[in-house]
């Protein structure tokens, strides 16, 4: 039977834990509250708004069995594998619909959960609550994490870090330093499941087995005499899961890197640029200013490059710090290994895409940095409590407390400010171009934002700037072709579309724009050919299917049009496809199917006046006058000047009054 004072002590500890967790949750949440009102930006629109995989559970097999962009068809064939990201979007869509708030809330909750796991892992590793609190608090507030939290697509790093930390914590449970751990199958199953989810978040998780092996043989205290088989049994599950994942990526998906983006870069160049990147990442961790969403990559070609020299200096400092910590405070040298191992996968510029350097790549590695800062601050604080000069020590403690508070406030303010940069696409792209004026992809994206608002002059300006030096992108060429098409400069437009196709034959936009241009020019056979090519490249593109369906209707090809609208609805249920199917069924006299089509459209869009008017026509044909009037009036709420509907209401109400 437990003694009362032990129960009281246990209750006090639980209350203290609750207070600590509440503080950490507030530190994680409060700086990001203003991000909840941000919109979809950058890749969010394609990966959420235009992605049928996100809108239906029937694509679950494709989510986990294919790469991220395969919903785009041939142009989306890559080895970029992030199934847990798409699955998270699917769950958020089912809960919140297409409200950006829900997706931002998901990121915020995940960030808070990661902060709590940082605290738990730190305490398990170093057995020091003060260090754990400082490290996790610093991690919660660090502005370098804004991209991962404020940008919805940053969820990949949040998921990776959550399951990576959880897996490491479960591994530490198997390798408990204070006692012999009871190894149950449940523990191993949880470890395998958690690590599998980490790998399904991002391949960066492959470094976890290496970290576990190093920790097991070099850092875990208390069992120096342990048998080798006792040690390897703890990390063997991680190694087996990693091997299975590598085999799956290699044989089912074709590898890890989607392409060698810089095939001309030599391996000596890879090393030089990796050193330069290390210097840049260390600089952003220590002094997180001039943050931006996109950094233009400038290749380093010489050891004398200032960025390489800065990286070498950083490596020398880290090596010296590691050697000193190994001798004086060995457990904390593991923090440097954590940073190096988790950052290593993003240091190969030869394989990295256009954005070689990105702040979000620091989300997981920064934990090691936070451990070191936590250790330094805790050591200074405790040192300021011992000595023979109380007044001086009190002053030192006050100075430490003020410094910590100042840094925390500075970080929180910088985070709040950075959240505003992600508010919407125009703000994001303008802010990014202020910092990186030669970012061609950002000029392209800003031009798209202008074009969607009908500002074609500014769109053209941005796309011309996006051409820049070197080989232009197929996207930019296609967009400029669209401008020339709208200016009726068809020959120039066709030339730009052809250039885009030669650069990227699987890119669907130039085929679609060529089809639309040929329609304007009256070259209907050529238009039909381009439409057919486009839908073969992007079979799940509902907008393309619907556009092609309308074209076929105008040519009197109702049967072919029906097929396009049906495939559109099948790919991703949408009101436009069902509206057109309803019109076709109504014209064919199939009133039952027409009614089902219009009702399906209204289920997807309750203010779809086209469906309301279609149902009204059906009711009128079937003599259900009161229902017809009600449907016409429902449609008039969103289309109050529709002459046909107004006349129908007047006519039908006149009939009922008679």
What does each of the following model-derived ranges do?
Residues 2-488, 509, 513, 543:
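Polytopic membrane enzymes that build or remodel cell-surface glycoconjugates and lipids
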Residues 435, 469, 503, 537, ...:
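Structural marker of alpha-solenoid helical repeat scaffolds
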């Amino acid at each position: 039977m437990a003694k009362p004072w032990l129960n009281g002590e246990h209750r006090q500890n639980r209350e203290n834990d609750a207070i600590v967790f509440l503080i950490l949750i507030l530190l994680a949440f409060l700086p990001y509250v203003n991000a909840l009102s941000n919109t979809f930006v950058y890749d969010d629109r394609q990966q959420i708004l235009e992605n049928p995989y996100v809108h239906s559970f029937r694509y679950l097999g494709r989510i986990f069995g294919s790469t991220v962009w395969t919903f785009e068809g041939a142009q989306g064939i890559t080895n970029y594998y992030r199934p847990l990201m798409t699955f998270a979007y699917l769950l958020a869509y089912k809960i919140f619909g297409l409200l950006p708030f829900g997706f931002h809330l998901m990121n915020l909750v995940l960030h808070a959960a990661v902060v709590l796991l940082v605290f738990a892992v730190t305490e398990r590793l170093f057995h020091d609550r003060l260090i754990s609190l400082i490290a996790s608090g610093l991690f919660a507030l660090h502005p370098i994490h804004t991209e991962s939290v404020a940008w919805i697509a940053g969820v990949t790093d949040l998921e990776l870090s959550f399951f990576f930390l959880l897996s490491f914590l479960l591994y530490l449970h198997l390798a408990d330093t204070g006692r012999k751990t009871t190894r149950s199958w449940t523990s191993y199953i949880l470890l395998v499941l958690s690590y599998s989810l980490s790998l399904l978040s991002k391949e960066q998780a492959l470094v976890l087995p290496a970290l576990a092996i190093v920790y097991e043989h070099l850092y875990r205290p208390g069992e120096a005499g342990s048998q080798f088989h006792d040690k390897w049994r703890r990390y063997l599950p991680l190694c087996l899961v990693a091997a299975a994942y590598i085999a799956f990526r290699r044989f089912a998906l074709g590898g890890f890197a989607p392409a060698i983006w810089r095939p001309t870069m030599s391996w000596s160049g890879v090393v030089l640029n990796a050193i330069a990147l290390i210097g840049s990442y260390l600089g952003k961790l220590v002094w997180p200013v001039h943050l931006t969403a996109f950094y233009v990559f400038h290749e380093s070609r010489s050891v004398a490059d200032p960025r390489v020299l800065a990286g070498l200096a950083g490596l020398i400092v880290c090596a010296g710090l590691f050697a000193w910590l190994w001798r004086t405070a060995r457990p904390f040298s593991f923090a440097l290994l954590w940073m190096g191992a988790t950052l290593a996968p993003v240091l190969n510029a030869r394989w990295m895409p256009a954005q070689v350097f990105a702040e979000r790549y620091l989300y997981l590695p920064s934990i090691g940095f936070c451990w070191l800062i936590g250790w330094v601050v805790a050591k200074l604080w405790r040192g300021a409590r011992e000595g023979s000069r109380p007044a001086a020590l009190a002053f030192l403690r006050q100075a430490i407390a003020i410094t910590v508070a100042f840094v925390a406030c500075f970080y929180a303010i910088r985070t709040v400010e950075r959240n505003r940069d992600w508010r919407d696409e125009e703000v994001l792209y303008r802010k990014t171009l202020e910092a990186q004026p030669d970012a061609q992809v950002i000029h392209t994206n800003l031009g798209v934002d202008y074009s969607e608002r009908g500002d074609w002059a500014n769109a053209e300006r941005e796309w011309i700037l996006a051409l820049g030096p070197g080989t232009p992108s197929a996207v930019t060429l296609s967009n400029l072709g669209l401008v020339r098409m709208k200016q009726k400069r068809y020959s120039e437009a066709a030339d730009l579309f052809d250039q885009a196709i030669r650069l990227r034959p699987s890119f669907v936009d130039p085929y679609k724009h060529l089809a639309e241009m040929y329609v304007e020019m009256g070259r209907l056979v050529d238009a039909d050919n381009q439409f057919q090519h486009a839908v073969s490249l992007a079979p799940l593109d509902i907008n393309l299917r619907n556009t092609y369906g309308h074209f076929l209707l105008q040519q009197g090809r109702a049967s072919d049009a029906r097929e396009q609208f049906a495939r559109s609805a099948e790919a991703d249920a949408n009101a436009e496809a069902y509206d057109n199917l309803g019109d076709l069924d109504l014209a064919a006299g199939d009133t039952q199917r027409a009614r089902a089509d219009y009702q399906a459209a209204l289920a997807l869009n309750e203010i779809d006046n086209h469906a309301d008017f279609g149902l009204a026509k059906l009711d009128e044909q079937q003599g259900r006058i009161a229902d017809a009037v009600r449907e016409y009036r429902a449609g008039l709420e969103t289309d109050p000047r529709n002459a046909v509907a107004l006349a129908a209401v007047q006519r039908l109400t006149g009939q009922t009054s008679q």
